[in-house]
Structures are given as structure tokens and as C-alpha cells.
Amino acid sequence: AGYSARWLQAVLRGRLGFGGAIFTDDLSMEAARHIEGRAISPVEAVRAALDAGCDLALLCNQSLDGGKVLDETIDGLARAQLTGRWQPRAASGARGQALLPREPAPDWDALMRSPAYLHALALIP
């Protein structure tokens, strides 16, 4: 479904009214990079997923090898944008921005002493 505009836009967003961010599967997994039985590159997979309606693409554990796959994907998206083969969606950017924290992270030591944290910790068997 991650490459299907029908499922992502018509069903998930349209029929079901989902307004949150849609993430891809981990596109570094080869099994997640097949369309119609054909293996595709991470760059092609990211473009296809974003074109279908995903807002954020996951390429997990790709900081290895100097981040080569990440760099190739960013470069590939930039080339696709310059040649008119892909355009980022403003709505996708807004949904991604909505996931960012609105305030600084709490101090770790203060968090570990907070009643909410201590209560949650006590619930763990």
C-alpha cells in the first residue's frame, strides 16, 4: 500500500479522513523496494512512495558507509525536482513539521525524578 495513491490518498485520507503524517516502511529493506515484481533503488522507492502520498520516507541504518544511500537519495530527489519529475508537497512538509517538539526536551535528571515518570516506571513488571 505504500506505493499506492489509491490506498494512501483515496482510502486513508479521503474515505477514512486520516490527517496525520504517513510514513513509509523502512525502504532500506530490499523487500520493501519492489513495485510490480521489480526491485527498485532506494531513490526510486522514496520518490514512488512520496508520489503516492507518503509524507516521510524511512531509510533506517543508512548512516553506515558514510551515509552514501542518504546522500544519493537527497541528490536524486534534488535532480528529480530540478527536472520536474518530482515536486515536494507543502501539506507533507506541514505534517512533518507538526511532529516536531514544541518545547525543549526536559532535563534528564528532572525527568527521572518526575511523578509521571516514577508512576510509569512502577507499572513496568
Where are these regions (language model features)?
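C-terminal extensions of enzymes
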Residues: 100-125
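Second-shell residues forming the walls of enzyme active-site clefts
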Residues: 1-97, 105-110
